[in-house]
Structures are given as structure tokens and as C-alpha cells.
Amino acid sequence: LGKQQYKGEVDLKAFEAFQNACKHPLIYNGDINSVEDIHRIQEQFPGLAGMMIGRGLLANPALALEYRQNRALEFDEMREKLQSMHKCVYNQYAEQLEGGDEQLLNKMKTFWEYLMPQADRKLLKAIHKSTSLKKYNQAILAFFNQR
């Protein structure tokens, strides 16, 4: 077995060989970014005990819901869910972190590293370049007000 981390492509042939040799319940993990990816892996490896979604869920926080409901969320519905999740994470960090505004700002900017990569680059750049919570919150407001 090798250690690939986040580089390269998933080696599905190696995974299949491992699955065939493995006597234990097996969980698939690797490059699941859409409902289609989930279905493809389920078809290709029907004996799986489960899947770990990871960064795909960070990029699209509604991925599990879309899978469960077998439909893509509408833009406004996605925005509402993302805004709710952001508010929850922001408030939890604000409550628990003891390093002040700068620590909260850095944590929240990290939150956006994988989140919504298909979003408007200008708006994401404004979030990442914000130097104060005031500027961050302005950038977030602009992000959630986009059409």
C-alpha cells in the first residue's frame, strides 16, 4: 500500500484488487465530488460498507442532501443552507476561540479554502484577502447577495 495524500488520481484498479482480497468491510475514500460520483462508485464496487466524502462535502455542503433527495438544490436553496452553515461555524468559532478577532478571521478564511470552488473568483478573493472581521463580513455579505 502507498500513501498518496491529495496528489494524483485515484487508482481504481488497485482499489478493486484490494477489495477482492480484503475479508473485512471496506469503506471507499477518494475524489467523490458529485452525486454522479457516488452512483458510479456504488455501481463499480457494490460490496462496499460505505464511502467517505471529505473534500467533496466541503466543496458542496449539500452533497449528502442532494444524494439522499436525488436532486440538485436550486441556487437560492443552496445559498440559504450555505449561509446557515457559515453562520453556525462563525458563531461557534467566535464563542470558543480565545485568540480574538485575528484568530477568528484566520479560521473563517481557512473555512473557504475548499468551500464552493465554482463560486465567483472575485468574491472568494475578497474573502481571502480580508484583513479585518469588518472587511470579511462585508465580503461575506457580497458573496451571499450575488445572483
Segments from the language model and where they lie:
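Alpha/beta catalytic cores of nucleotide-metabolism and tRNA/nucleoside-modifying enzymes
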Residues: 6, 13-28, 32-147
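Short, small-residue-enriched loops and turns at beta-alpha junctions
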Residues: 1-8
